[in-house]
A protein has these predicted regions:
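Sec-exported extracytoplasmic/periplasmic mature domains
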Residues: 45, 72, 91, 145-149, ...
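Secondary-structure end/capping motifs
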Residues: 224-305
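Boundary at the C-terminal end of the N-terminal hydrophobic targeting segment
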Residues: 19-21
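Bacterial N-terminal signal peptides
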Residues: 6-16
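Conserved C-terminal helix/tail region of periplasmic/extracytoplasmic solute-binding proteins
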Residues: 294-328
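Periplasmic-binding protein-like
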Residues: 102-112, 195-224, 236, 276-278, ...
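Short, glycine-/small- and polar/acidic-enriched structural segments
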Residues: 23-163, 169-172, 176-183, 202-204, ...
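Positively charged n-region of N-terminal signal peptides that target proteins for export
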Residues: 1-4
Length: 328
């Protein structure tokens, strides 16, 4: 009898837990767990996803993880990526669609040492510049093309050093400049002992070379599924709630990031500082893509006369369907 009762209890518990289990959503991040993705971790920690009936799995990225490949292979429902790489992938046959744009501004920069002769963009000619690849190189290549600087190492151009994920090429003198983000690597350079007066910083946002970063992308075919669209509406709504909470509570958001840093490599000082910088980039966005920002990004990517990132105006690369339903 006791065995029968136990079996009934187990069956009832299973039925109840199944009935109340949220719809599963997996998001693939562009990089490792850090404040760059605070909105998603905050939304999960504060129960915003639960309130929308979602069971969200957050997959950190890394140097050997290509979010678009994970998405294409069915390993995620939605991914965080920069628009240049997403549009380049779309032109090459992977139909990615932007469904939301939490980041309004670009944090990408080129940070240079003044003692290596770089004070203005005119000084870049003949210099070695550290550049990130894996899709991150597209804004840089477009910018160099607009400046009339070849990237093949010729005398009238620049030499591109394939940069890893550190800033050692700059600090050790291998490159005059390296790629940095306003919220991350720039501060690593500063922590290495360099003062603002010793550095020349070119912000893509002010150089007219900025492109949209950290948008949410899905596969186009999935948007034909009503249940998938419904999940994305709820996901975007909860995620933007997480982002606005993180903006208003940077220290708490940083603490949540540290709690989810399974690798244990992040520090409180760095994450609090990063969250403060990230908030400057998400400010002004409610999650809905601004068509003028999209048009600017496309213009930048197509502006390379000899080697444009994309060769034609994209069609169907973004939609307001999700954000209109989620935010209005």
């Amino acid at each position: 009898m006791k065995k029968l009762i136990s079996m009934i209890v187990i069956m009832f518990t299973t039925i109840v837990s199944t009935a109340f289990a949220g719809d599963k959503v997996t998001i693939q991040l562009k990089w490792v767990t850090q404040a760059q993705f605070a909105g998603y971790y905050v939304a999960k920690d504060k129960g915003f996803y639960d309130a929308e009936g979602l069971d969200v799995t957050i997959k950190p990225g890394g140097p050997d993880i290509a979010p678009a490949q994970v998405l294409a292979g069915g390993g995620a429902d939605v991914m965080v990526d920069w628009m240049p790489s997403a549009l380049a992938a779309r032109e090459k046959g992977l139909p990615l669609v932007n469904i939301a744009q939490p980041f309004k501004s670009s944090g990408m920069m080129l940070t240079c040492r003044k003692d290596m002769g770089v004070n203005t963009t005119d000084d870049l000619k003949g210099k070695t510049l550290g550049v990130w690849f894996y899709g991150n190189e597209y804004p840089f290549l477009s910018w160099m093309s607009r400046l009339g600087l070849a990237t093949d190492g010729s005398a009238n151009g620049v030499t591109v050093l394939k940069q890893g994920w550190g800033v050692e090429p700059l600090t050790e003198g291998q490159a005059a400049c390296v790629s940095t983000m306003s919220y991350n690597e720039y501060w690593v350079v500063r922590d290495a002992g360099y003062t603002p007066e010793q550095l020349t910083v070119f912000k893509y946002q002010t150089e007219g070379a900025s492109t949209l970063e950290d948008g949410l992308y899905v596969l186009e075919k999935n948007l034909g599924d009503a249940s998938f669209k419904d999940k994305m509406v709820r996901f975007v709504r909860a995620s933007m709630k997480g982002w606005k909470y993180a903006e208003a509570n940077p220290k708490e958001a940083a603490s949540i990031i540290l709690d989810n840093d399974d690798a244990g490599v992040q520090t409180e000082k760095h994450q609090v500082r990063m969250m403060g910088e990230i908030a400057k980039l998400t400010a002004g966005s409610n999650g809905s893509l601004d068509p003028s920002d999209y048009a600017r990004t496309v213009k930048v990517l197509m502006s390379g006369a000899s080697d444009p990132v994309i060769t034609k105006e994209p069609s169907g690369a973004w939609t307001h369907d999700i954000t209109n339903a989620a935010l209005n």
